[in-house]
A protein has these predicted regions:
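Short active-site neighborhood of thiol/selenol oxidoreductases, capturing the structured segment around
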Residues: 56-74
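Bacterial signal peptide processing site
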Residues: 23-25
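Short, internal strand/loop/helix patches
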Residues: 114-161
C-alpha cells in the first residue's frame, strides 16, 4: 500500500513538472504553424554534389527557402537577412543551416549554387535535383513557381514564394516567415529552437 506521504510527494512532483512546463512556454515572433507545417522531408543534391535528405541536417535548426540565383531582388535580400540572423546568433549559429532550394535547376548548376550560397553564409547550402524532386518538395510546402517568358537573350524570371520555413533540430515544422520578417524576429525564434 502506498503511504499518504508518498502520494503527497508524487502529487507535489507532478505539480512541479507541470509548472516547469508552463515556464517553458515559447512566445514566437514569426507565425507558429507547428500544427499544419509538415516535417522536413526531401531527397535532393547539395551544392557540393552529395545526395542529401532531411536526415542529413538532423541536429540543426533548418531554415528552408525556395529561390533562384538569377533572382534580381527578393531572393538576395532574403538570403542576406537569413545570413545576418545566423551571424547574430554568434557561436550558436553553427547549429543552423539555411537550405536554399533552387526552383531553376537549368541555370542553377552546382558550381553556381555553391558560389551563390557561400557568398551569403558558410551555413547556407544550395539544394537542387531533378524537376520532379524539386516539385515534390515544393508541393509538400505548398510552394508554387512558374517561369516567365524568355527575352531575346534567353533570360527569364521565375515567380515563386517568398516564404521561409523553419524546422526544429529534430525536423519538426515549426515556424513560417517571409522576406518581410525582421532579422531580430528570426534571431529571437531560432534562438528558442536552438535551446530546445
Amino acid at each position: 500500500m502506498i503511504s499518504r506521504r508518498a502520494l503527497l510527494a508524487a502529487g507535489s512532483l507532478s505539480v512541479a513538472f507541470a509548472l516547469a512546463g508552463c515556464g517553458k512556454k515559447q512566445h514566437w515572433d514569426l507565425d507558429n504553424v507547428s500544427s499544419v507545417l509538415p516535417n522536413l522531408q526531401f531527397h535532393l543534391t547539395s551544392d557540393t554534389g552529395q545526395k542529401v535528405t532531411a536526415e542529413s541536417y538532423r541536429g540543426k535548426v533548418a531554415i528552408l527557402y525556395f529561390g533562384y540565383t538569377h533572382c534580381p531582388d527578393v531572393c538576395p535580400l532574403t538570403m542576406s537577412h537569413l545570413a545576418q540572423a545566423v551571424t547574430e546568433l554568434g557561436p550558436a549559429g553553427k547549429d543552423v543551416r539555411i537550405l536554399f532550394v533552387s526552383v531553376d535547376p537549368a541555370r542553377d548548376t552546382l558550381p553556381v549554387l555553391r558560389a551563390y550560397t557561400q557568398a551569403f553564409s558558410p551555413q547556407a547550402v544550395g539544394l537542387t535535383g531533378t524537376m520532379d524532386q524539386i516539385q515534390d518538395v515544393a508541393k509538400r510546402y505548398h510552394v508554387a513557381f512558374n517561369y516567365g517568358k524568355k527575352d531575346q537573350y534567353g533570360n527569364y524570371v521565375v515567380d515563386d514564394s517568398a516564404a521561409i520555413y523553419i524546422f526544429s533540430k529534430d525536423g519538426r515544422g515549426t515556424l513560417i516567415g517571409s522576406d518581410q520578417s525582421s532579422v531580430k524576429s528570426i534571431v529571437h525564434d531560432v534562438r528558442q529552437l536552438l535551446a530546445d
